[in-house]
């Protein structure tokens, strides 16, 4: 619902979408529609900003019983944020995290056709709170959804909730327009 609304407010209809991704080719978070970056990869679009700040999560994300260090699945795959691996390698998408204490999961990881390296679990967990506890709903979440129901503009609502971050991104857009960024 939210993505459709966001895209519609930017003149993109769902029926015209053949491909959608939330990471650009340099592995930064950035909305892509039909293999085109929605925004310059150095500039964060409002949809991605709202998602990464936990504003647009579903209600169950704020009370997820699986958001803890103790894993119940055979394997958990995620980003390698906070690990000892080179930032450039992580940025290029050459690394991901897999957590597993289960025999099946360990076998699966060991049989992957890539180089596998152990990292400090505590460091990685400290950079990805979902591995410790559920996301916390932002203070303005209810306001955001109340206004969305009234068909208010997505971008303006995000700017109202996160003015400093949005101003910074808007300055980048202006600088890019004048070839200063």
Question: Predicted regions span which residues?
Answer:
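Long, compositionally biased charged/polar accessory segments in the mid-to-C-terminal portions
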Residues: 15-181
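Contiguous mid-protein beta-loop-alpha structural module that forms a pocket-lining wall or clamp
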Residues: 1-16, 20
């Amino acid at each position: 619902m939210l993505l459709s609304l966001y895209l519609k407010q930017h003149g993109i209809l769902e029926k015209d979408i053949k491909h959608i991704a939330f990471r650009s080719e340099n592995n930064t978070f950035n909305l892509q529609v039909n293999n085109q970056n929605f925004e310059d990869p150095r500039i964060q679009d409002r949809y991605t900003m709202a998602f990464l700040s936990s504003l647009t999560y579903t209600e169950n994300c704020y009370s997820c019983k699986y958001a803890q260090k103790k894993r119940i699945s055979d394997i958990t795959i995620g980003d390698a944020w906070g690990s000892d691996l080179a930032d450039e390698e992580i940025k290029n998408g050459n690394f991901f995290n897999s957590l597993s204490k289960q025999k099946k999961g360990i076998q699966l990881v060991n049989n992957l056709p890539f180089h596998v390296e152990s990292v400090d679990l505590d460091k990685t967990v400290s950079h990805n709170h979902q591995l410790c506890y559920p996301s916390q709903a932002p203070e303005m979440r209810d306001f955001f959804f109340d206004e969305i129901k009234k068909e208010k503009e997505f971008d303006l609502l995000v700017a109202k909730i996160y003015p400093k971050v949005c101003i910074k991104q808007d300055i980048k857009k202006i600088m890019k327009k004048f070839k200063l960024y």
